[in-house]
C-alpha cells in the first residue's frame, strides 16, 4: 500500500480510498467563510412569517439558530472536514 494520493485528489490514497488529510504541520491561520442559500415559498407563507402569524412561533429566529448550529456542526455534516475553532457565526 502506498500513501501517495491520486493525482490532484488530496482526500484519496493511491488505491482510491478516502483518507483524512494530515494537517498537523499547518500553522494556525485566520479564516473566513461565507455561505448562501435560498428558500422558496408561497407569497402567503412569506407574509405570515413577516407578520409573525405562524402558530408554531418565530420562524426566522429558528432558522437563524439552525444556521448557527450548522456552522458549529460542519465537521459532523461534511465528510473529511476537519473541526475548526469558531470565534463567531453570524446569520443574516
Curated annotation (Swiss-Prot):
Q: Which Pfam families match?
A: MoaC
Q: What is this protein called?
A: Cyclic pyranopterin monophosphate synthase
Name the UniProt key words of this record, in alphabetical order.
Answer: Lyase, Molybdenum cofactor biosynthesis
- Pathway listed: Cofactor biosynthesis; molybdopterin biosynthesis
User: Signal peptide: which range, if any?
Assistant: none
Family as reported in the entry's similarity comment: Belongs to the MoaC family.
Question: Where is the organism placed in the taxonomic lineage, from the top?
Answer: Bacteria, Pseudomonadati, Pseudomonadota, Alphaproteobacteria, Rhodospirillales
User: Is Lyase given among the entry's keywords?
Assistant: yes
Q: What is its EC number?
A: 4.6.1.17
Question: What SUPFAM superfamilies does the annotation carry?
Answer: Molybdenum cofactor biosynthesis protein C, MoaC (SSF55040)
Q: Which GO terms describe its biological process?
A: Mo-molybdopterin cofactor biosynthetic process
Tell me, in a sentence or two, what this protein's role is: Catalyzes the conversion of (8S)-3',8-cyclo-7,8-dihydroguanosine 5'-triphosphate to cyclic pyranopterin monophosphate (cPMP).
GO terms for MF: cyclic pyranopterin monophosphate synthase activity
The positions annotated for binding substrate are 80-82
Describe the subunit structure.
Homohexamer; trimer of dimers.
Catalytic activity field: (8S)-3',8-cyclo-7,8-dihydroguanosine 5'-triphosphate = cyclic pyranopterin phosphate + diphosphate
Species of the source: Azospirillum brasilense
Which chain positions lie within coiled-coil regions?
Answer: none
